[in-house]
Design a protein with these regions (language model features):
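A composition-biased, non-transmembrane "mature-region" signal
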Residues: 1-326
């Protein structure tokens, strides 16, 4: 982006979150990319940042006026950091790494004009937006991905999960065995409605499992596409439903599991820590998900609210969940 005072900045979008950052002078001593780990803390520009995402990314295309040459095959290893309302990225595509600092922003606050038109509700791109239509490489069933935001698609017919960021459509996980339990969504993929007064569409369905003392507890998660590229979640366990939103501002940056802490004027107390494993994937998702993916989850409660931290080898995310009547 170029501003009226000729400053330039970068607006990024991932999973419905928009972040505006500006290039800053980086300290001379920065860790190497392969020495950085999710969850650790780094002190930069007087702030104690937490590493929340690590991606060994690759640029696949570029358009418009850019300060450097881009194109397919351009390697861009990046590390994302958060501290309260602040956001930073270390870009290891150059040596020394580039440092970009800024904050998440609401899309409407950008007051953008001349944007691509969306259909009513904003959940589905119009006919001018290129959609991918292909066949499941496992069973041959027809599949589709509505936009470039979609990184993986789960086949409802056989249970395989396909990488849609690769036009070769490689499998992220194979088809489920016939004897494996399959869940039917309570809310069908493609269902449309209003959630808290805003239009949404169900585009993805996922089943996860926790094992506790040898007993399996399965829960279901529905990915909802909303207006202007936003996403929300509905989760269900044993008939109990929650609306969940991924947070831009993380409640705390501690690697430890706290007994309690304050967030949004509420005191949240530790409820449980467990491993969640993906059992089933159906529909479209904005990241590469696969069956048998495992994450550590830590839940804190202040009924009817719950804060949930999910941690994998490459990412930490927080979600605020609110109990709703079925």
């Amino acid at each position: 982006l170029m501003f009226d005072d000729m400053r330039t900045g970068w607006l990024s979008e991932a999973g419905g979150e928009y972040v505006l950052t500006f290039l800053k002078l980086a300290p001379e001593s920065l860790p190497a990319f392969d020495q950085v780990h999710v969850g650790e803390n780094l002190t930069l520009l007087g702030r104690n940042w937490q590493v929340t995402n690590i991606e060994d990314a690759e640029c696949i295309a570029g358009q418009g006026e850019l300060p450097f040459k881009v194109g397919a095959g351009y390697k861009a290893p990046v590390v994302d950091l958060r501290e309260g309302d602040h956001f930073a990225t270390l870009d290891y595509s150059e040596s020394p790494p580039l440092l970009f600092v800024g904050a998440p922003v609401k899309f409407e606050s950008l007051a953008m004009t001349n944007l691509r038109d969306l259909t009513a509700g904003g959940a589905i791109p119009d006919i001018n937006v290129e959609a991918q239509v292909f066949r499941c490489p496992s069973c041959g069933s027809p599949l589709s991905a509505r936009s470039a935001d979609i990184k993986s698609v789960g086949c409802e017919s056989c249970g395989a999960v396909v990488d849609t960021s690769d036009r070769n459509y490689q499998l992220l996980s194979a088809a489920l065995n016939p004897e494996e339990e399959r869940y039917t969504p309570h809310i069908a993929i493609g269902s449309k409605g209003n959630l808290e007064g805003k239009p949404v569409e169900v585009i993805g369905f996922m089943v996860k499992r926790q094992l506790c003392d040898g007993v399996a507890y399965d829960w279901r998660e529905y990915l909802l596409a909303g207006e202007q590229g936003t996403y929300r979640w509905l989760t269900e366990y044993d008939g109990h439903w929650n609306v969940a939103d991924v947070l831009s501002k993380h409640p705390h940056g501690s690697r430890k599991i706290l007994n309690e802490f304050k967030y949004g004027g509420e005191t949240f107390k530790h409820f449980s820590t467990y491993q969640g494993r993906v059992l089933q994937v159906v529909g479209e998702f904005t990241w590469r998900v696969a069956c048998n993916d495992v994450a550590e989850l830590v839940d804190y409660i202040a009924p009817p609210l719950m804060l949930s931290r999910e941690r994998t080898e490459s990412e930490i995310s927080w979600s605020l969940c609110r109990y709703v009547a079925p």
